[in-house]
Amino acid sequence: MAGLEAIKYGRGRLEVLDQLRLPHEFVYDNVSTCEEAFDSIKSMRVRGAPAIAIVAALALAVELHHKKDDSKTKQETVQYINKRLDYLLGSRPTAVDLSNAIKLLKRVSQAAAETTGTNDDNAACANVRNGYIVAAEKILEDDLTTNLAIGRYGAEYLRRQQMPIGEENNDDPSKFFTTSPPCTQGAMDKTYRKLSVLTHCNTGSLATSGHGTALGIIRSLHKMNYLDHAYCTETRPYNQGSRLTAFELVYEKIPSTLITDSMAGALFARMKDIKNISAVIVGADRVARNGDTANKIGTYSLAVLAKAHNIKFIVAAPTTSIDLETASGEDIKIEDRAPTELTQISGAVVGKDGHVDVNSTARVAIAHQGINVWNPSFDVTPSMYIDAVITEKGEVVRSSQGTFDFKAIMPERWAQQVEGKEPNGKAQVDDGTLFQMENI
C-alpha cells in the first residue's frame, strides 16, 4: 500500500474501506448509491466525523454524475438533492460534520439553480448537478489540508508546553530534542525531553481523507522528532483503537503501545514521569459553543483522569465540527447502539499453535446473552476538563474563567449563527441555511 486511504474517489466512482474487517483484511466496498452510503455509515464500516460527511456527500455526487435523479427541471434536481441529503443525515445524527456538510450542499445546490443562465431545462439540471458535485469534491480536497494544519498546530502547541532542561543530560539522546525558541534568531538552542501522549478511538487516515485529526497531531509530533511514545486505548466496545489506531501506528512505524480503556489511570500514575506523558489527544464528533465535546464513549473518563494527573487534555477537530448553534453538551443527541456490540465480538481465528488465520473469521459471545445492556456510542466531556481545542485555524485555549471563545477563529459564522446576522449585518431569518464551511 502506498498509503492508508479510507476513501477512494474518482468522479462517478466511490470506494470505501470496510473498517470492520481491519486489521486482518483490506477490502474496499463500491458505494454507488445513498442507500449504500447510509448502510456503510450506520454499520460503522466507515466512521470518523470527517469521513462520514465525505462519504455521504460523495455518494450523492456519484448518483448525480450518473443522472439517477431523472429530473426534468432544475427545481426537481434541487428537490432530489435535498431529499437524499435529508435521508443521509439519519445515518449518524451525532456527527456535526455531516449536518454541516448537508447544510452547505443544500445552499450550493439552490444557488446553482438560481444563477444558471439558461432556459434549457436539461442544461439547467446539469448545472445544478455539477455545482453539487464540485462542492462535494471540495469537501474531500479541503479535509486533507485541514488535517495537516491541525497536526502542525497541535504539535507546536504541545512543544510549547515543554520545559527546557537546565543542565546537561547524558541520558539516551534519542529521548530528547533540541530547538531554538521561535522568532528568536541567534538564540541559544535549548534541550527538551520528547513527550508521550495517549489517544482514544481512531482519528487518523482511516477516519478522514488523510493524516487525521488527533492522530494527525501524533503523526506531526513524530515527524518533527518531538514524540517519544504514543499510547492508544482499545476503545470498547467497537475496538476502534485496537483494530484501527494500533494498525495505523504500526503501519507508520510510530513507537506505540496498546492499553485497555481501564488501564489509563494506572498508566498515568506509573508512567507519567518516566515517559513524560504530556497530553491526552482525542477527536470530536461535535463541539458545542461552550466547548463541551461529544466523542467516542470513554472520552469523558479519560478527561477526568487527565485532570487528576495534571495532564493536558486536547481536542483536535476541524472548525466544521464546532457547532455554534448548540449552546452546550446538554443539547447534543447521543445515539444508542445494539447490545450485541458488548456481548459479542468478531475476529480472525487463532489456531492452537498461536497462528492467526486472517482468512478465517468467527463471531463469539463474551457475555451472557440475557443480560441487559446500555450501549451509548458517545459521551460528552464538559469543557472544564478540556485544556485546548486545536483546529486548522490554530488553538483555542480555555480561558482563566473556564470558557472557550471560538469567535476569533470563526468571525463570520459567529456573526451568522450566534448573533443572527447575515454577512451584510442584517438579521438572519432562517434556521441555518447561511452556514458555510470555512474552507469552501
Curated annotation (Swiss-Prot):
Keywords, in A-Z order: Amino-acid biosynthesis, Cytoplasm, Isomerase, Methionine biosynthesis, Nucleus
Keyword set includes Nucleotide-binding: no
Catalytic activity, EC: 5.3.1.23
GO biological process terms on file: L-methionine salvage from methylthioadenosine
Compartments where located: Cytoplasm; Nucleus
InterPro entries: IF-2B-related, IF-M1Pi, IF_2B-like_C, Initiation_fac_2B_a/b/d, M1Pi_N, NagB/RpiA_transferase-like
Annotated site, Transition state stabilizer, chain positions: 201
Keyword Ribonucleoprotein assigned: no
UniProt-recorded Gene Ontology molecular function terms: S-methyl-5-thioribose-1-phosphate isomerase activity
Enzyme class: isomerase
GO cellular component: cytoplasm; nucleus
Name of this chain's protein: Methylthioribose-1-phosphate isomerase
Organism of origin: Botryotinia fuckeliana (strain B05.10) (Noble rot fungus)
Lineage: Eukaryota, Fungi, Dikarya, Ascomycota, Pezizomycotina
